[in-house]
Structures are given as C-alpha cells and as structure tokens.
Amino acid sequence: MESEYREMLLLTGLDHITEEELKRFKYFALTEFQIARSTLDVADRTELADHLIQSAGAASAVTKAINIFQKLNYMHIANALEEKKKEAERKLMTNTKKRGTQKVENRSQAENCSAASATRSDNDFKEQAATEVCPQAKPQKKQMVAEQEAIREDLQKDPLVVTVLKAINPFECETQEGRQEIFHATVATETDFFFVKVLNAQFKDKFIPKRTIKISNYLWHSNFMEVTSSSVVVDVESNHEVPNNVVKRARETPRISKLKIQPCGTIVNGLFKVQKITEEKDRVLYGIHDKTGTMEVLVLGNPSKTKCEEGDKIRLTFFEVSKNGVKIQLKSGPCSFFKVIKAAKPKTDMKSVE
C-alpha cells in the first residue's frame, strides 16, 4: 500500500502544481510535518513525497497533503487526491475480506486433512515426515516458510501488459527451489516502472528491450514482481508507449541521500563509485559515494571474479536497503547480482627511447 500512496501523492498531487505553488505547499508542510526547513527547501517533488511519508506514514501523509491543498484552495488537486485515497482504501478492504475468507477455507481444509491423516498407514506417515523435516526443519528456515505463505497471498492471476526496458543475462543462485538460473529485468507501464525477478531462465527470450509482453500468474511483492515457472509470459501486439519521464526514472541510479530515507527492504539497482573497500573472510564492505553523501554496501560471499579497487564502479542489481544498528546500508541477498566496472586508466604520453 505504501507504494500506492507514494504514487498518488506524487503523480496526482505534487506533479500538478507549479514551482511557486510548490513553495507555498512547503511553507504549510512545516507545520503539518516534522521536517526541517533546510530539508524541505532543497527537496524536489520526488524527494518531498518521500520525506512526507517518512515523517507521517503513507496514509497520514496523503491526508495531511489533502489538508494543505485545501488550505491553498487547490480544490481540484485535493478532490482528486481524496478520491484516489478512497479508491485505494476500498481496494485494501476488498483484498482483506478475500484473504479472510481464504484463511477460513484453508483452516477448514487443514482440519479435514488433519482428520483424514489419522487413518493413514505408517508408511504414508513416514513419507510425509521425511518431506517435512527437509530443509525447513532448520530454525533459520522457519521465517522463509512464513514468507512463502505471505507470498502466495499476493498471487496475481490477472494479466499485466508491460514494456521491457532492460534484462540482464541469466546467472546461477540459490533459491527456495534449490540452485537454478535466474535473471532480473526492468519493465514499465504508461505510469510506472517495476523491477522483476524471473526464476525461470527460459523466459529470457520474452524479456527483450522495447518488446511489449503480457504477464499473468505472477507474484507481487511490496516493491517488485516475481515471475516463476508457473507464470505465463506472452508477446502482445500493442501501441503501448512508455513516457520518457518513466524511462528516465527507471534508468537513473538513485541518489544516496534518497536511499537513506527509504524503508528497509526497498530494492535498489544502480551504478555507484567506490571510495573504500574492507575485505573479510566471507564478505566485502564497499564504501560508495556521490554528490549527495556516502553509504556502505555489504556484499556477502564472493561477489566478483574481477578485483575491485578504489575509484572503480560497482553495478548493483537487486540489492536491498537494510539497517546495521542505526546505520542505513545496502545489502546483497541470495538473488542479488554484482559487477565491477573498472575505472578508465588515464592516458599517458608515450616517450620514445633513443
């Protein structure tokens, strides 16, 4: 839901006011939100939306923004935002009811299965026990099982038409199904872009840049799509066009100052310059920087065969925002991809030897 509120706050609200109106909005935001004036003054529209949500929470930020637009007598924006918010809340209520009904049905099925299992033979029982003890028996796997159940609730059967912007080559990694080849892609609709984790390398011939495809039976997480072997991906003939501003946002490397205010779990792709490297036995800590600040990137395992040096750049794919104590950092996961881009060596004048 947070992504929906962020989208409506930006696209339905802040993007529809002029620079002068934005200054007035920021003036009233000082009293509505606990944000420093210095932070508000330099924030662009996207950063402002992030600051508002970080300060008040997603739903509350939209409500407060509506109040400000009403004070400024920008009623067309206030009304549009209010309608979008009600629509999102209705959708949430509908999904909650559906999930509640599904849970009751699942509980009933589980009780029936439990009663039926009492009549199973010893051999059947042993076979089932052997299956259940397998990797999930480890304590650290319990959370993974819970996450799998949560993922199933977000199965999207309705097709989504998107245009492929980018796809990397398949690589091997550990997944819940074991070691397999996967790849990552970026796709877009006419209003937004999404990162996609594709758990079946056979779909690679569908994810060709500029091609329009239809995806169904996929999993939707809070900030990315997951395409599995059960998903359906087909080519479609469509006049589907992605606006330049959406393409630009999809290709941009997020600024470090913006990453530091993102919630944990946010997926990050981008190219960053390295200024410090700390190597340990099973991990490497990279210090990255840009014009807006510095940050650390924690890469677990052996990230790359190419040795990284200060001044090189690292391309991160499917990394996550995480916390190390109070410090915000980027962290690799089981399906992250890491690549070193060597810095160009300065050209030196060739001296002749006589």
UniProtKB/Swiss-Prot annotation:
Keywords: Cytoplasm, DNA damage, DNA-binding, Immunity, Inflammasome, Inflammatory response, Innate immunity, Nucleus, Tumor suppressor. Inactive in absence of double-stranded DNA (dsDNA). Homooligomerizes upon binding to dsDNA, dsDNA serving as an oligomerization platform. AIM2 requires large dsDNA to generate a structural template that couples dsDNA ligand-binding and homooligomerization. Homooligomerization is followed by recruitment of PYCARD/ASC to initiate speck formation (nucleation). AIM2 and PYCARD/ASC homooligomer filaments assemble bidirectionally and the recognition between AIM2 and PYCARD/ASC oligomers occurs in a head-to-tail manner. Residues 1-87 form the Pyrin domain. One of its GO terms (molecular function) is pattern recognition receptor activity. Its main location: cytoplasm. It comes from the Eukaryota. Residues 109-120 have a biased composition (Polar residues). Residues 95-124 are annotated as: Disordered. Coiled coil: none annotated. It is found in: Cytoplasm; Inflammasome; Nucleus. The keyword Nucleus applies. Disruption phenotype: Mice display defects in neuronal morphology and changes in behavior, characterized by lower locomotor activity, anxiety and reduced auditory fear memory. Mice are protected from pyroptosis of intestinal epithelial cells caused by acute ionizing and subsequent intestinal damage: in contrast to wild-type mice, crypts of Aim2-deficient mice maintain their integrity. Mice develop more tumors in the colon in the azoxymethane and dextran sulfate sodium model of colorectal cancer. Expressed in developing neurons. Highly expressed in regulatory T-cells (Treg). One of its GO terms (biological process) is negative regulation of phosphatidylinositol 3-kinase/protein kinase B signal transduction. Residues 144-341 form the HIN-200 domain. Degraded via selective autophagy following interaction with TRIM11. Signal peptide: none annotated. Induction: By TGF-beta. Pfam families: HIN, PYRIN. Self-associates; forms homooligomers in response to cytosolic double-stranded DNA (dsDNA) and the dsDNA seems to serve as oligomerization platform. Component of AIM2 inflammasome, which consists of a signal sensor component (AIM2), an adapter (PYCARD/ASC), which recruits an effector pro-inflammatory caspase (CASP1). Interacts (via pyrin domain) with PYCARD/ASC (via pyrin domain); interaction is direct. Component of the AIM2 PANoptosome complex, a multiprotein complex that drives inflammatory cell death (PANoptosis). Interacts with EIF2AK2/PKR. Interacts with MAPRE1. PANTHER family: INTERFERON-INDUCIBLE PROTEIN AIM2 (PTHR12200:SF17), INTERFERON-INDUCIBLE PROTEIN AIM2 FAMILY MEMBER (PTHR12200). Sensor component of the AIM2 inflammasome, which mediates inflammasome activation in response to the presence of double-stranded DNA (dsDNA) in the cytosol, leading to subsequent pyroptosis. Inflammasomes are supramolecular complexes that assemble in the cytosol in response to pathogens and other damage-associated signals and play critical roles in innate immunity and inflammation. Acts as a recognition receptor (PRR): specifically recognizes and binds dsDNA in the cytosol, and mediates the formation of the inflammasome polymeric complex composed of AIM2, CASP1 and PYCARD/ASC. Also acts as a tumor suppressor independently of its role in inflammatory response. Able to suppress overt cell proliferation in enterocytes: restricts stem cell proliferation in the intestinal mucosa in an inflammasome-independent manner, contributing to a decrease in the likelihood of colorectal cancer development. AIM2 suppresses cell proliferation by inhibiting phosphorylation of AKT1 at 'Ser-473', preventing AKT1 activation and AKT-mTOR signaling pathway. The pyrin domain mediates homotypic interaction with PYCARD/ASC. This is Interferon-inducible protein AIM2. It comes from Mus musculus (Mouse). The lineage of its organism: Eukaryota, Metazoa, Chordata, Craniata, Vertebrata.
